[in-house]
Amino acid sequence: MSTKPKNAAHLSESAQVDSGSVQPFTRSQKIYVQGSRPDIRVPMREVTLDVTPTDFGGEINAPVTVYDTSGPYTDPNVIIDVRKGLADVRSPWIDSRNDTERLPGLSSHFGQQRLSDAELTALRFAHVRNPRRAKAGANVSQMHYARQGIITAEMEYVAIRENMKLQEARAAGLLTQQHAGHSFGASIPKEITAEFVREEIARGRAIIPANINHVELEPMIIGRNFLVKINGNIGNSALGSSIEEEVAKLTWGIRWGSDTVMDLSTGKHIHETREWIIRNSPVPIGTVPIYQALEKVGGAAEDLTWELFRDTLIEQAEQGVDYFTIHAGVLLRYVPLTAKRVTGIVSRGGSIMAKWCLAHHQENFLYTHFEDICEIMKAYDVSFSLGDGLRPGSIADANDAAQFGELETLGELTKIAWKHDLQTMIEGPGHVPMQLIKENMDKQLECCDEAPFYTLGPLTTDIAPGYDHITSGIGAAMIGWFGCAMLCYVTPKEHLGLPNKDDVKTGIITYKIAAHAADLAKGHPGAQIRDNALSKARFEFRWEDQFNLGLDPDTARSYHDETLPKDSAKVAHFCSMCGPKFCSMKITQEVREYAANQRIEAVDVDVARGLAEQAERFKQEGSQLYKKV
């Protein structure tokens, strides 16, 4: 059977970047903060603000720095060509450690087969580098370096990134007020330092997913003592999609704030598509290797073997995948516990491994070969994302014996991974009513010794198809506050169909709101800067600043235009809901002006004097209770 792509849209020569993903944000500029060496340049987005109107004091408002996941795509000084991929960021750092070697070619059998297939030439990414691997006996994981007391360039990079110029913001008066947080036992410092990052990684409380073969990566960190992160999912299906479409899904997602991206492809040309995605991704890429392994055996779970899965791990590690979801906690003895569930096993990876276990009546080969998996992953610094194959698919099944039994096993596997100095996070539910969410977080912290938790929502009710980004956003905000480190987004199409670009954006913005709300509640240093700046802009009727400081400036601006479309409305001193006579903020401004004119402090208006003035006016007008108007 020919593997040649039939659709011309698949061809590499036609691939172009998505135009919507490369537009700079209005009144924003990409800035880079340099670290201790010239090649540590940490990207951020700086939002320029208007001067406060003269009526409100006329002061200059300092620019606000915000976290930026969009990579070079929103930098007008960078020429983007998806056919060449992004610039190499990390090779000098990796070279300086002198513990890796460049292989003469791909070492996975499947990778070699794909490379030798001439019919795939038109589809293949043209600028593939030979992969790196740890030298014999070496461990190249960030956790290994951290436990040796080494602060890597990646650790310094994420420390700078997490702070977002916090010292400068304080000096500019952008953080005059921040409410104290309640962190539920997290140890969040007033400022993130590179040494703190090293300590957290060494302890296992945080990870920097950073495969040595993903040199285009802009490093980021996942951990309960850092900013809450979000993940977005992409991937082709059996129906197929073009290279251009898959890269567009990536760039669109990171534009709106996706900190990592999981490629869940199940269709044709998975290997080639993944190469394009990684070469064009500034954020960590995660996969579920069992999906591709299943494709290799024609979808028959019972035909899976350790040897085939091992080759798939090597194939993906050599491409540069940063973290693997491994469903090693789905044990044979747990499968019967799901029999009386309302929704059974809803995890695709979990159901694959459950079917394999039952077909062979043997223990999960991902569990029995777990240390072999560790040996592969530490040679490339691929992080574990230990999959929750028995997560609840309905609130009726939340916190049951199957779910928590698997979680306890994931805790055991975490300790084995840590023995190999492997970075590890734990995946969680799913569907959980609000009153049971904290129990999930507490149980995970206990079983997995504070390894980062990564959850899908959770959805807090099952009655809202079409609105599951909201049902899950509620749970995501709660579990993020309780200590969850990364939240996997849910779109409005969850359970219903494949999301389009608008759905993806809606899901990401919903989860950015949840993550930020959790950061505020935890008391992350500087989390309130953006809120304070936007609130000040709102009170001063600086409309453009309100739009530009928001998570989604385009939608905010379009909603305002629906009511007040003229440019003059963008400087109006009233809001679009109440109009000029009933705007509460306009009235408050008038009260302040009155107080100032009467030489009365706005914060301590002389109420008695005001009452006396009104009483005298009542008498002068005839002391009539009612007057004709």
Curated annotation (Swiss-Prot):
Positions of [4Fe-4S] cluster binding: C575, C578, C583
GO MF: 4 iron, 4 sulfur cluster binding; carbon-carbon lyase activity; zinc ion binding
Superkingdom, taxonomy of origin: Bacteria
Listed cofactors: [4Fe-4S] cluster
Binding site for Zn(2+): H431, H495
EC number: 4.1.99.17
Keyword Iron recorded: yes
Residues noted as binding substrate in the record, renumbered to the chain: N233, M262, Y291, H327, S347, R348, G349, D388, G389, L390, R391, E427, Y454
Keywords: 4Fe-4S, Iron, Iron-sulfur, Lyase, Metal-binding, S-adenosyl-L-methionine, Thiamine biosynthesis, Zinc
Free-text cofactor note: Binds 1 [4Fe-4S] cluster per subunit. The cluster is coordinated with 3 cysteines and an exchangeable S-adenosyl-L-methionine.
Region (Disordered): 1-24
Quaternary context: Homodimer.
Function: Catalyzes the synthesis of the hydroxymethylpyrimidine phosphate (HMP-P) moiety of thiamine from aminoimidazole ribotide (AIR) in a radical S-adenosyl-L-methionine (SAM)-dependent reaction.
Name listed for the protein in its UniProt record: Phosphomethylpyrimidine synthase
High-level lineage: Bacteria, Pseudomonadati, Pseudomonadota, Gammaproteobacteria, Pseudomonadales
